[in-house]
Amino acid sequence: MPKLLVIFNIIYPLQSLKKDTFNFWWSFQKWKYNKTMSGLRQVLDGKIAIITGGASGIGAEAVRLFTDHGAKVVIVDIQEELGQNLAVSIGLDKASFYRCNVTDETDVENAVKFTVEKHGKLDVLFSNAGVLEAFGSVLDLDLEAFDRTMAVNVRGAAAFIKHAARSMVASGTRGSIVCTTSIAAEIGGPGPHSYTASKHALLGLIRSACAGLGQYGIRVNGVAPYGVATGMTSAYNEEAVKMLEEYGEALGNLKGVVLKARHIAEAALFLASDDSVYISGQNLVVDGGFSVVKLMTT
């Protein structure tokens, strides 16, 4: 038998065995994951959620967490490739993507319609889309950047609250609306001027919407992060993330833990679920006590 054929006859079965071994390993990992999740109390089982800004950062972590807890999620974002890839990675039976510019009310209304037509209802809105302008002196405040920040962070949230609440009221759904605010909604100093103004305004909107929607059984709350490394706060390469996390930890009150996007998603999950059934109008601050014990110093 020629030497080349002998080598082929030896290697091919080994490659086939390697492939079979990998397939077995991968099947086992999926079985183990499903077994773990089946033992988890799924606090959003059967719920339908919209997550804005859901393609990356806090939003993407929330998409993963909400679907792990039984929800079907519509990822709303302008980052189409990231959003589509995230939906595919989770499974299109659990997550789907809808491209939407939150500053365009028609886009917002259509995103809610898409969700209701696809799933029959809407239970949860996590309004998380936001922008952060560069730090600078108020003496040099860029009013065009100010308008853009307010348009995304406040007007966009207002449009989604409006249309999500309309859907919930029409279907008699006792829903939950959660908005990503910031510790900059509680104090001045930690954030850029336009961002701080927008988050103060958003917190006012949350409290006002809470008053208006309570009669329908709809809860409205905010979740307020301390500094967390996401694509909005850094270029999101390893070096930038590490630097931002080290900076946040050095300034933070709670030592020994680094705030991650996952921690904010977990707070949003609590507010979205019936575990917080009698909580409304609140701003759940996830800052390790930073905002109540000291102010940021320069």
Swiss-Prot record:
Pfam families: adh_short_C2. Keywords: Oxidoreductase. GO terms for molecular function: copper ion binding; oxidoreductase activity. The keyword Zinc-finger does not apply. NAD(+) binds at residues 50-74. Belongs to the short-chain dehydrogenases/reductases (SDR) family. This is Short-chain dehydrogenase reductase 4. The lineage of its organism: Eukaryota, Viridiplantae, Streptophyta, Embryophyta, Tracheophyta.
